[in-house]
From Swiss-Prot:
UniProt organism field: Bacillus cereus (strain ATCC 14579 / DSM 31 / CCUG 7414 / JCM 2152 / NBRC 15305 / NCIMB 9373 / NCTC 2599 / NRRL B-3711)
Similarity comment: Belongs to the class-I aminoacyl-tRNA synthetase family. IleS type 2 subfamily.
This protein's domain notes: IleRS has two distinct active sites: one for aminoacylation and one for editing. The misactivated valine is translocated from the active site to the editing site, which sterically excludes the correctly activated isoleucine. The single editing site contains two valyl binding pockets, one specific for each substrate (Val-AMP or Val-tRNA(Ile)).
Protein name, as recorded: Isoleucine--tRNA ligase 2
Span of the annotated motif 'KMSKS' region: 590-594
One example of a Gene Ontology biological process annotation: isoleucyl-tRNA aminoacylation
Residues the entry annotates as binding ATP: K593
Coiled-coil ranges (or none): none
UniProt EC number: 6.1.1.5
Entry-linked InterPro entries: aa-tRNA-synth_I_CS (IPR001412), aa-tRNA-synth_Ia (IPR002300), Anticodon_Ile_ABEc (IPR033709), Ile-tRNA-ligase (IPR002301), Ile-tRNA-ligase_type2 (IPR023586), M/V/L/I-tRNA-synth_anticd-bd (IPR013155), Rossmann-like_a/b/a_fold (IPR014729), tRNAsynth_Ia_anticodon-bd (IPR009080)
PROSITE patterns listed in its UniProt record: AA_TRNA_LIGASE_I
Subcellular localization, as worded in the UniProt entry: Cytoplasm
Job description of the protein: Catalyzes the attachment of isoleucine to tRNA(Ile). As IleRS can inadvertently accommodate and process structurally similar amino acids such as valine, to avoid such errors it has two additional distinct tRNA(Ile)-dependent editing activities. One activity is designated as 'pretransfer' editing and involves the hydrolysis of activated Val-AMP. The other activity is designated 'posttransfer' editing and involves deacylation of mischarged Val-tRNA(Ile).
Length: 1033
């Protein structure tokens, strides 16, 4: 075995392992070795390479890698194809910034073709950094053959899907109100909108709409979007709600009966009550009469009007509201559009022309006040949608879009979701299920440039539509020969014209590109160029057994995968979804570069190593919970887990090499109870870890492993050290080596999916082969000893209580004590005699015994709980307290047993004192200290005799010399001679314990003499001494 370099950094170790993986193609071998095995399928959600990875990506990649490695070691064939999401507005915006241009007009001036070329160049800006990050974190995924959404084969598969949807009559062109980003100048789909809501404070206005031909009657309408008022064409009421005409000062206001108090507040008189239907068709004067409307400015009925907020009357602007548009269409009213594609007012609103509408709320309100049409204004906090790409507030615009009729197969969506297992499970019928319940048709088209072109050609003459499902089909119907290397992007596909199969006219492609979420949602099919190639491979890799991404993908990739698959095949594309929570900063705030609280995962890997980062992300909390995260979290993972394991591994290799122990040879072994215990713990942990991993409970699995490693290090190895230090190779020493070897090799396999680098380092050195080509450990039931584990757990509890007891009384473990008494509070069949020596050695006591009668070592004190007793006993409270203090121990014990006592000396007669009135304190017998956990109480005799004190000094001396040996970097098995220069009293103490010193310090000769200032000095409490240490002859 190679010597373990304990000074090697985590990053150094990981770089060395990565080099070995690359040189020996371990990743490729891990897949090839499972050829012919059952497939386990997972899909890689494609990141964009025009932005750098963040800590959330580290979590996602860690989870996906863990699952893939575990399933591979469990016997499955797991293909891992990387992917890149390369289209969309983020790319366009980045290129615009790079070119110093802004908006569609300037893009077209620059030229579509050169702009598209720039987009292609920019999408892999950070590919090198992504590859390095992916490899450095240990995520095994095939980045040499990724699917790329901009490539022709991928787009052709997307076209096949869209062509099939069109063939089914589910893709249509419609006029409707859609969410629109004025900054990006394109519409968005409902699932995109759902990703960008923010809580904001906007100016709201209650507006006076003057009833036509009346002197002083007004409808009151309330709006949180005053900018839409210039486009008002109607007011809506609910026909079945009651409305009042109420006089306030010289005006009469019409408002919903249930809102009148909230709106008018005071000093009003209700004149009459009317059903909403009585108000229908009442005309009013437009508040902004700047553009003629032929049919409008009257009251209409709408079932979406409620009395929950506002005035019970809704201002209707059909160009900017979905409900508004629908009701105006059904009423046949006029349509008024006063905003351009940049979100700025047109000449229809002359005094605000060219201004961004969301900046004009104050201007609108001022205008209304000036015209005497403002009843009330106030700031209103509400949730408002913002663009998920550029963060601009969205507007709702009426216009033509291409839509997919998802609502037509809503039942399929819901049934497919019912078959999926969600982690966490509340997502299924909660956040995701409710989104499906309320979904609308998918707005698939985008009026942009860099994206998959929508493959619909329309006839100039007869409006016939043609949606080719392949390049070959497009070529077949093209009016002229198309290039062999036709690129499926704008402007190249726009140059292809098709002959109309219906009238023989010319067909041109509709100019839009598609929603990028449709691109990524098509990846199960398009990654293999299905159905044009790889049919068998596709069928083997569909559906996914699991997908895992951040919770923000609930209405993103999770939805688009489900939707595309349902529309195309009717089938569900995945069996399980792991919806990962956000990684937050220490204060629970979302990380962002602008706030300065973002952690760079690359920096964390460079500083602490990928194993530590992965472990920190996994052991902290379940991955679907939002987690507070910091550098300290990673540092703790490194020190408490990774470094602890490396120290155990280093210890084993060091002593095995010294003893020339070879695990492949056969030795006479005699397993101790400690060996049997650790093997049982190893296999019971294996059982729990496999169960947890099979149920995707990664944190539970990690915590089981962490507990095992801690016990191996701080209990098994520490309790076995003397066996490793013995000279020669007896049966018990061989058993210790054999046991620790099995423990380390098995742990390396258990942790391989979690911390792949340190796992590989251990397994490679101990077994000579890659752990990632090994099978995952299987429990050996014959080694399980639950009774032994329970007994050792009891011992560990007692030892922990003893240490806690010593800490509380400032008694170092090196200081021997006379006695430990164990009080058991629950009867069990624990054989404490078998563990006597362990407890005495661990807690450094000279005697140990178990006592069932705790009254021999403890007594109770009763104090009145004034918080509860004060109100109960009133003026008698002090008398009752005094009475409690003078009770005999027998009376106190009786109260503790029964929880009841009667005090009869009050003027009012007897008083009943119960358990809730009293604080019970357990007091140790004089000379003893006690610590309890409810199950056990540990009593320590704290009287330190002179003899015990001297032994404590000798043990402190041993500790100091052992530290000194470490500083000198002496081999652990080197026998030494020691010369000591110190005061006579310490000489006597050390001489009296010479055997103890020689046993623990590998001392051959121990003498006292005069040393010079050139020799080293040690501190032993207040005492200074000089020491000379040399190799023994």
């Amino acid at each position: 075995m190679e010597k373990v370099d304990v000074k090697e950094s985590a990053v150094g170790r990981e770089m060395r392992i990565r080099k070995q993986w690359n040189e020996q193609n371990i990743f490729e071998q891990s897949i090839q070795n499972r050829e012919g095995a059952q497939s386990f399928v997972f899909y890689e959600g494609p990141p964009t390479a025009n932005g750098l990875p963040h800590v959330g990506h580290a979590l996602g990649r860690t989870i996906k890698d863990l699952v893939a490695r575990y399933k591979t070691m469990a016997g499955y064939k797991v293909l891992r194809k990387a992917g890149w999401d390369t289209h969309g507005l983020p790319v366009e915006l980045g290129v615009e910034k790079q070119l110093g241009i802004s908006g569609k007009h300037e893009i077209e001036e620059y030229g579509i073709e050169p702009f598209i070329q720039k987009c292609k160049e920019s999408v892999f800006t950070y590919e090198k950094q992504w590859r390095e990050f992916t490899e450095s974190i240990g995520y095994w995924v095939d980045m040499d053959d990724p699917y790329v959404t901009l490539k022709n084969p991928y787009i052709e598969s997307v076209w096949h899907i869209l062509g099939t949807i069109h063939e089914k009559g589910l893709l249509y062109k419609g006029h409707r109100v859609s969410p629109y980003c004025p900054s990006c100048q394109t519409s968005l789909s409902s699932h995109e909108v759902a990703q960008g809501y923010k809580t904001v404070k906007d100016l709201s206005a209650t507006v006076k709409f003057k009833v036509k031909d009346s002197e002083n009657e007004y409808f009151l309408g309330w709006t949180t979007t005053p900018w839409t008022l210039p486009a008002n064409v109607a007011l809506a009421v609910h026909p079945n709600m009651e409305y009042v005409k109420a006089k306030q000062e010289s005006h009469v206001y019409i408002v919903a009966k249930e809102r009148v108090q909230e709106v008018l507040k005071e000093n009003y008189e209700v004149l009459s009550v009317h059903k909403g239907e009585e108000l229908l068709n009442t005309s009013y004067t437009a508040p902004f009469p700047m553009k003629e409307v032929t049919n409008g400015y009257r009251v209409i009925a709408a079932d979406f009007v409620t009395g929950d907020s506002g005035t019970g009357l809704v201002h209707i602007a059909p160009a900017y509201g979905e409900d508004d548009y629908r009701v105006v269409q059904s009423e046949g009213l006029s349509f008024l559009h006063v905003v351009d594609e940049k979100g700025e007012y047109t000449e229809a609103v002359p005094f605000l022309k060219g201004k961004f509408v969301k900046d004009c709320d104050v201007d609108i309100v001022r205008y209304l006040a000036k015209e005497g049409l403002l009843y009330h204004k106030e700031k209103y906090e509400h949730s408002y949608p913002h663009c998920w790409r550029c963060d601009s507030p969205l507007l709702y615009y009426a216009g033509e879009s291409w839509l997919i009729r998802t609502t037509a197969i809503k039942d399929t969506f819901l049934q497919n979701n019912d078959s999926v297992t969600w982690y966490p499970d509340h997502m299924k019928h909660g956040r995701f299920g409710k989104f499906l319940e309320n979904m609308v048709d998918w707005n698939i088209s985008r009026n942009r440039y860099w994206g998959t072109p929508l493959n619909v050609w329309e006839c100039e003459s007869c409006d016939h539509q043609f949606a080719p499902k392949s390049i070959a089909e497009l070529r077949k119907h093209s009016t002229k020969e198309t290039p062999e290397d036709l690129e499926l992007h704008k402007p190249y596909v726009d140059e292809v014209q098709v002959c109309c199969g219906k009238c023989g006219g010319t067909m041109n492609r509709t100019p839009e590109v598609i929603d990028v979420w449709f691109d990524s949602g098509s990846m199960p099919f398009a990654q293999y160029h299905y159905p044009f190639e790889n049919k068998e491979l596709f069928e083997e890799q569909f559906p996914a057994d699991v997908i895992a991404e951040g919770i923000d993908q609930t209405r993103g990739w999770f939805y688009s995968l489900l939707a595309v698959s349902a529309l195309y095949t009717g089938k569900v594309p995945y069996k399980r979804v792991l919806s990962l929570g956000h990684v937050l900063d220490e204060e629970g705030q979302k990380m962002s570069k602008s706030k300065g609280n973002a952690l760079d995962p690359v920096d964390l890997v460079d500083k602490f190593g990928a194993d530590a980062l992965r472990w920190a992300l996994l052991v902290d909390s379940a991955p679907w919970n939002a987690k507070r995260f910091s550098e300290r979290t990673v540092l703790e993972a490194k020190s408490k887990f990774v470094d602890t394991l490396v120290n155990v591994y280093s210890f084993y290799v060091l002593y095995a090499n010294l003893d020339e122990y070879n695990p492949k040879e056969t030795y006479d072994v005699k397993l101790t109870k400690l060996d049997e215990w650790v093997l049982s713990r190893l296999h019971s942990t294996t059982k729990k870890v496999r169960t947890a991993l099979d149920d995707y409970q990664f944190t539970n699995a990690a915590r089981e492993i962490a507990a095992l490693v801690d016990e191996v290090s701080n209990w098994y190895v520490r309790r076995s050290r003397n066996r490793f230090w013995e000279s020669g190779m007896n049966a018990e020493k061989a058993a210790a080596y054999e046991t620790l070897h099995e423990v380390l090799v098995t742990i390396s396999k258990l942790i391989a999916p979690f911390t792949p680098f340190v796992a590989e380092d251990i397994h490679l050195n101990l077994e000579g082969s890659s752990v990632h080509l090994a099978d995952y450990p299987v429990v050996n039931e014959s080694l399980l000893q639950p009774k032994l584990e329970a007994e050792m757990d009891a011992v560990l509890q007692v030892v922990e209580l003893g240490r806690s007891n010593r800490n509380q009384h400032s008694l170092k473990v090196k200081q021997p004590l006379a006695e430990l008494v164990l009080l058991e509070h629950n009867e069990n069949d624990m054989d404490w005699e078998s563990y006597r020596d362990i407890v005495m050695d661990e807690l450094n006591v000279k005697a140990f015994h178990v006592e069932l009668d705790e009254t021999k070592y403890t007594s109770y004190q009763l104090k009145l709980n004034f918080k509860t007793a004060g109100p109960k006993f009133g003026k008698n409270v002090n008398a009752v307290n005094g009475w409690l203090k003078q009770l005999s121990q027998e009376e106190v014990q009786n109260f503790v047993s029964t929880g009841r006592a009667v005090y009869e000396a009050t003027p009012e007669g007897e008083v009943v004192v119960t358990g809730e009135d009293v604080l019970v304190e357990k007091v140790a017998k004089s000379g003893f200290s006690n610590t309890t956990n409810g199950q056990y109480t540990v009593m320590l005799d704290t009287n330190v005799t002179e003899e015990l004190l001297q032994e404590g000094v000798a043990r402190e001396f041993i500790r100091a010399v052992q530290e000194y040996r470490k500083q000198l970097n002496l081999p652990v098995n080197l026998r030494v001679d020691i010369i000591l220069d110190t005061e006579e009293e310490l000489q006597r103490t050390l001489t009296n314990h010479k055997d103890l010193l020689e046993e623990n310090l590998l001392v051959k000769q121990f003498t006292f003499g005069h040393l010079t200032n050139e020799d080293d000095e040690l501190s032993l409490g207040e005492t200074k001494l000089r020491i000379k240490l040399s190799a023994a002859n």
